[in-house]
Design a protein with these regions (language model features):
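Conserved SAM/SAH-binding loop
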Residues: 21
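Conserved redox-active cysteine motifs that mediate thiol-disulfide chemistry
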Residues: 18
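A short glycine-rich, Lys/Arg-flanked "PGG" loop and its adjoining helix->strand segment in the class I
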Residues: 465-483
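Nucleic-acid endo/exonuclease domains
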Residues: 458-463
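Nucleic-acid modification enzymes, centered on SAM-dependent nucleic-acid methyltransferases
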Residues: 1-15, 25, 29-398, 405, ...
Length: 490
């Protein structure tokens, strides 16, 4: 009412030319205003479509899945019907995936009970050969040997050196836990104690001689967790061929925000995933098309099936965030790949089980997304466009509210590629214009990144400031003169 009163009963649409994660357009829609979101980054564009554009198209519609047909008499408000279908078809996709790759995620026998338990994580460490000629141990690079620090349930790995080799046993309680073997400056050989400089580790990785070794398994004992050393069966099960259709896109090797820019010879995105992880993610992604056809068979329109596919593609993206070699094991759970706005090297990592009930599982990703969808406002139509903020996109008579990029604070385009490669696989046939490039567009991204200007901070600064000047000129064209423009710059 206050908005109507302040706008003469005719509130203008709210336009954000740097929509990003969609907060401003979403909250404008929640206030009952038409929202228009724009961004150059296709990942941001898809996030905004999923939050403000798609739900508004299918507002108050009942689901089409067979399980919900007995509830058709019920009132489906907002995006509840959409959420119901995402949950149903997400479960169907999981069942199809398990039929194909479930054997790659076997259970483990718990020694104390003889019962089988679901593995929720496999703990791995990267390894390089010790440079000491008298040693030559395949030395594990471990940040911490702790498995659990939970009071009364402490567990840790004890490395045992025998005949120049190392094996691991799981110990419980508050024993003397060995310090980790790797730091920012280098590592220490667990067998001979030799100090190993970081440059040697980088050179070994560049030469393709860095390996990975499974150290332990974490099992769901329901209740509680069980920890046990890796066995040959689980090691062999994890040793699968790389899938034929893995994502082959290159990583940016000029930015320190990515591990590819830190001298380890990591040059392509697929190198951030184990072969088992690649197999799972490509399988989930490929099955979206099958499920999309099932939506149509159950009575949904083609457009509606594409909407369901869009959300399932985001489930795959969320799955990828918990299914890479960038997932540390900390605090008794798997840490997401993007614990911060960078992709550093993670020495000892946790491989999740998408078919478990713990962190990194498919069901959890579905639940997270459907809970969010149920709470979306979706009562006003919205528009999302992919465009360059420095160019006039033709929007007029709007109220502009935006949170622009901050010089070189965050390289969103470089980081977004992690999610883009999976979204593109799943959605390029539905949104060909948004996924026309192999990677996220970067050259025109409005950030002051020196590496894009041969290392010149001054040129990067001038590019950013000139670009922001052009953006402000465009905003003057877009906005209704009787309303102020709000720009958040902290």
């Amino acid at each position: 009412e206050e908005i109507k009163k302040s706008t003469g009963g005719n509130p203008p649409p709210v336009f954000d030319p740097f929509a990003g994660g969609g907060t401003i357009p979403l909250e404008a829609q929640r206030l009952g205003l038409k929202a228009i979101a724009a961004d150059l980054n296709p990942v941001a564009v898809m996030i905004n479509k999923a939050m403000i554009e798609i739900p508004a198209k299918f507002q108050d519609r009942p689901p089409v899945n067979p399980a919900a047909k007995s509830l058709l008499a019920a009132e489906w408000q907002g995006a509840q019907g959409l959420a119901s279908d995402i949950a149903y078809y997400g479960k169907l996709l999981k069942e199809k995936a398990f039929a194909k790759i479930g054997h790659l995620y076997p259970k483990v026998k718990v020694p104390e009970t003889g019962q089988e338990a679901t593995v929720i994580a496999w703990i791995w460490a990267r390894t390089v050969k010790c440079p000491n000629p008298a040693c030559g141990c395949e030395m594990p690079l471990v940040k911490s040997f702790w498995l659990s620090k939970k009071a009364g349930k402490e567990a840790y790995l004890e490395p045992i050196v025998e005949d120049g080799k190392v094996r691991f046993e799981v110990r419980r309680g508050k024993g003397k836990v060995r310090e980790g073997t790797v730091s920012r400056t280098g590592a220490q050989c667990i067998c001979c104690g030799a100090s190993v400089p970081g440059r040697y580790i980088r050179d070994e990785s560049k030469a393709g001689r860095m390996k990975a070794r499974m150290l332990a398994l974490v099992a769901d004992l329901n209740p509680g967790r069980g920890y046990m050393p890796a066995d040959n069966f689980h090691i062999k099960t994890a040793d699968v061929e790389k899938p034929m259709d893995y994502p082959e896109q290159e990583m940016n090797q000029d930015t320190p925000d990515l591990v590819s820019g830190r001298g380890y010879g990591i040059t392509h995105w697929h190198q951030l995933f184990t072969h088992r992880q690649l197999t799972a993610l490509t399988t989930f992604s490929a099955l979206i098309n099958d499920v999309q056809k099932q939506v149509v068979a159950d009575g949904g329109t083609k457009e509606y099936s594409e909407a369901i596919a869009t959300y399932l593609a985001f489930v795959v993206d969320r799955q990828a965030n918990y299914s890479s070699t960038g997932n540390a094991w900390s605090g008794d759970f798997i840490v997401q790949t993007f614990g911060r706005q960078a992709l550093p090297m993670v020495w000892d990592y946790a491989e999740s089980n998408p078919f478990s009930d713990a962190t990194g599982n498919w069901d959890g990703a579905i639940k997270w997304i459907t809970l969010a969808i149920k709470r979306l406002p979706c009562w006003k139509s919205a528009k999302v466009i992919q465009c360059l903020a420095q160019k006039d996109n033709g929007v007029r008579n709007v109220l502009v509210s935006t949170d622009p990029p901050y010089y070189d604070n965050i390289g969103y385009a470089d980081l977004s590629d992690f999610f883009y490669i999976w979204l593109r696989r799943s959605l390029k046939d539905i949104y060909p214009e948004n996924f026309s490039t192999m990677l996220v567009p970067k050259a025109e991204e409005l950030v002051a990144t020196p590496y894009r200007f041969d290392g010149s901070k001054q040129d990067a600064k001038e590019f950013f400031e000139q670009g922001m000047f052009e953006v402000c000129q465009n905003i003057y064209q877009y906005t209704m003169q009787e309303f102020p423009v709000t720009i958040y710059y902290a």
